[in-house]
């Protein structure tokens, strides 16, 4: 597991104070109920290529702010962001809210939490 610096954790905690989070179990339950979720994987492209949540779209943290308006023009669309553990997705969620998106959730635990539960992944 990656060891994060105190300063990085400080900005993540700051972002988390302004965003809404969900967890892997809630996302899985919603998918099992047949809900159509807009899942965005904000990890690096190489991480996404290895595996990702079924149906997820890739918009890496480095480009999401640049490309989101073209991909998701409706600011009210519910978006569930995830990354490796929930840190990068919290930062990205905070930025999207600053851009006017009103229905953003960051999945706490990220794909590691999803994987640890044995939930299905798409490979490749």
Question: What do these predicted regions represent?
Answer:
Residues 1-38, 45-78, 84-124:
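Rhodanese-like catalytic fold shared by cysteine-dependent sulfurtransferases
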């Amino acid at each position: 597991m990656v060891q994060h610096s105190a300063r990085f954790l400080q900005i993540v905690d700051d972002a988390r104070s302004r965003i809404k989070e969900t967890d892997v179990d809630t996302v899985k339950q919603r998918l099992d109920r047949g809900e159509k979720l807009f899942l965005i994987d904000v990890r690096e492209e190489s991480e996404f290529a290895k595996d990702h949540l079924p149906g997820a779209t890739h918009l890496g943290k480095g480009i999401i702010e640049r490309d989101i308006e073209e991909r998701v023009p409706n600011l009210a669309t519910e978006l569930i962001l995830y990354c490796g553990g929930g840190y990068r997705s919290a930062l990205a969620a905070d930025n999207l809210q600053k851009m006017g998106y009103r229905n953003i959730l960051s999945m706490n635990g990220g794909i590691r939490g999803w994987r640890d539960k044995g939930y299905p992944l798409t490979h490749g």
